[in-house]
From Swiss-Prot:
Pathway: Amino-acid biosynthesis; L-arginine biosynthesis; L-arginine from L-ornithine and carbamoyl phosphate: step 2/3. The lineage of its organism: Bacteria, Pseudomonadati, Pseudomonadota, Alphaproteobacteria, Rhodobacterales. ATP binds at A10, Y11, S12, G13, G14, L15, D16, T17, S18, A37, G120. This is Argininosuccinate synthase. Homotetramer. Its main location: cytoplasm. The keyword Cell inner membrane does not apply. SUPFAM superfamilies: Adenine nucleotide alpha hydrolases-like, Argininosuccinate synthetase, C-terminal domain. GO terms for biological process: argininosuccinate metabolic process; L-arginine biosynthetic process; urea cycle. One of its GO terms (cellular component) is cytoplasm. The gene is argG.
Length: 408
C-alpha cells in the first residue's frame, strides 16, 4: 500500500498527540489535518489550534468542533434507552465517544481529500479497536495509522527526547510521568494506570475529579424530577432542555452529592483485565430515572426481553461495533420498546446514591385498583388464580411423577 499523502489526526493539543502530529510529518512526509472534538471534557480547545499552527498545520486544515449535542442526542441517549451496562456495572462513557470521533475523522477525510486517518490509542487498549472498526465500517478504503503500534518511542524518556528534538513545547508538569491517565467527556471521567494498576489497593482520593467524596457530600438530600418522552430525557424540574444541557445539569447535581463513582476491574476486548476508576454522576442519575419510568410504562414481556439483550448490546458498544448491523438491529428493537416510555421520575440524591422515589405517566400500566389490598370492586377475581396455578404446575407435577417412577 502506498504511503498516505494527507492524514486526518484525532488531535487533543496535548503532548502525546503533538508528538504524533510531528511523527506523521517526518515519518510519512504527509500533510496533516487535525480534528479536535469538544465532547464536554471541560478543557479550553483554542490552545489546540495554536499548537497545531505552531507545528506547521495550515489554518484551513484545523477542525475544532463542538459535538456535545450530537454526542448526547445520537450516541448517549440511544445507549441509555437500553440501560446499557458492560459487565453489569460500566456505563460505557469512553466506549460511546469513540464512534463519534472516528465518524468525524472519516467525514473530514472525505471533505479534505485525505486518504488516511490517525489516532493516538495504544496497542494495549480497546480504543484502537473502536476507532478502526468505525473507520472501516464507514469507509472500507480508508487507511488507518496507529503510531503507537509502529514507532520506537516506547518510553516516556524517548517521547520527551523526540519532543525536544522537534521543538514541541513540554509543559513543566509533563516532564515527569503523570500518576494516572485521564479521559473525560460529558458522560464521564475515567482514570487508569500507574497508581491505579494494583487492584488490591484503594484508589487515592486525588484520583476523583468530578464527584465529591460521598461521606463529605451534603447532609440533606436533594430531589430532582426528570421528564422523559419515548425513552429520552427532555426536561429537569419542569424546564425543557437540550440533551447536552440535561446531562450537564445532572452532572452538576450528581457530582455535588458524590453520585456515580465506580472502581472496576474489567475485561478488555484485547484479552487482558484492567482497573479503572469511573465517575459518571449524570449518567448514573439518568439510568436510575430511566429504569424508574420503564417500571410503570413497559410491559413485562417487552421489559424482560429488553433486559435479556442488554448485555450483548453493551458488549457490542464496548468492543467497538457501534456501526455493526447487529447493534443496529438491537437498537431497532430497543427503540420500539420505548414508544410509551413517557412520564416523569423523581430521584433522591444523597451521599453517593441516586434512588427513584416516585414516578408517574399518562402511559402507565400500573393499575392501583388491581393491586390494592382494599376492596377492588370486582377488578380482579382471586379465584382465577387457582386455574392459573394448576396449569403452570402441570408440567412440574408430571416431572415429579416421572422422577418418582424412575427411582422406584
Amino acid at each position: 500500500m502506498s504511503a498516505p499523502k494527507k492524514v486526518v489526526l484525532a488531535y487533543s493539543g496535548g503532548l502525546d498527540t503533538s508528538i504524533i502530529l510531528k511523527w506523521l510529518q517526518t515519518e510519512y512526509g504527509c500533510e496533516v489535518v487535525t480534528f479536535t472534538a469538544d465532547l464536554g471534557q471541560g478543557e479550553e480547545l483554542e490552545p489546540a489550534r495554536e499548537k497545531a499552527v505552531m507545528l506547521g498545520i495550515k489554518p484551513e486544515n484545523i477542525f475544532i468542533e463542538d459535538v456535545r449535542e450530537e454526542f448526547v442526542r445520537d450516541f448517549v441517549f440511544p445507549m441509555f434507552r437500553a440501560n446499557a451496562l458492560y459487565e453489569g456495572l460500566y456505563l460505557l462513557g469512553t466506549s460511546i465517544a469513540r464512534p463519534l470521533i472516528a465518524k468525524r475523522l472519516v467525514e473530514i477525510a472525505a471533505q479534505t481529500g485525505a486518504d488516511a486517518v490517525a489516532h493516538g490509542a495504544t496497542g494495549k487498549g480497546n480504543d484502537q479497536v473502536r476507532f478502526e472498526l468505525t473507520a472501516y465500517a464507514l469507509d472500507p478504503a480508508i487507511k488507518v495509522i496507529a503510531p503507537w503500534r509502529e514507532w520506537d518511542l516506547t518510553s516516556r524518556t524517548k517521547l520527551l527526547e523526540f519532543a525536544e528534538q522537534n521543538q514541541i513545547p513540554i509543559a513543566k508538569n509533563k516532564r515527569g510521568e503523570a500518576p494516572f491517565s485521564v479521559d473525560a467527556n460529558l458522560l464521564h471521567t475515567s482514570s487508569e494506570g500507574r497508581v491505579l494498576e494494583n487492584p488490591g489497593e484503594e484508589a487515592p482520593d486525588y484520583v476523583y475529579q468530578r464527584t465529591v467524596d460521598p461521606e463529605k457530600a451534603p447532609d440533606a438530600p436533594e430531589f430532582v424530577e426528570i421528564a422523559f418522552e419515548k425513552g429520552d430525557a427532555v426536561a429537569i424540574n419542569g424546564e425543557a432542555m437540550s440533551p447536552a444541557t440535561i446531562l450537564t445539569k445532572l452532572n452538576e447535581l450528581g457530582g455535588k452529592h458524590g453520585v456515580g463513582r465506580l472502581d472496576l476491574v474489567e475485561n478488555r476486548f484485547v484479552g487482558m483485565k484492567s482497573r479503572g476508576i469511573y465517575e459518571t454522576p449524570g449518567g448514573t442519575i439518568l439510568l436510575e430515572a430511566h429504569r424508574g419510568i420503564e417500571q410503570i410504562t413497559l410491559d413485562s414481556g417487552a421489559g424482560h426481553l429488553k433486559d435479556s439483550i442488554m448485555p450483548r448490546y453493551a458488549e457490542l458498544i464496548y468492543n467497538g461495533f457501534w456501526y455493526s448491523p447487529e447493534r443496529e438491529m438491537l437498537q431497532a428493537l430497543i427503540d420500539k420498546s420505548q414508544e410509551h416510555v413517557t412520564g416523569t421520575v423523581r430521584v433522591k440524591l444523597y451521599k453517593g446514591f441516586a434512588r427513584t422515589v416516585a414516578r408517574w405517566s399518562e402511559h402507565s400500566l400500573y393499575s392501583e385498583k388491581h393491586v390494592t389490598f382494599e376492596e377492588d370492586a370486582g377488578a380482579y377475581d382471586q379465584k382465577d388464580a387457582a386455574g392459573f396455578i394448576r396449569l403452570n404446575a402441570l408440567r412440574l407435577k408430571l416431572i415429579a411423577t416421572r422422577n418418582a417412577r424412575v427411582k422406584g
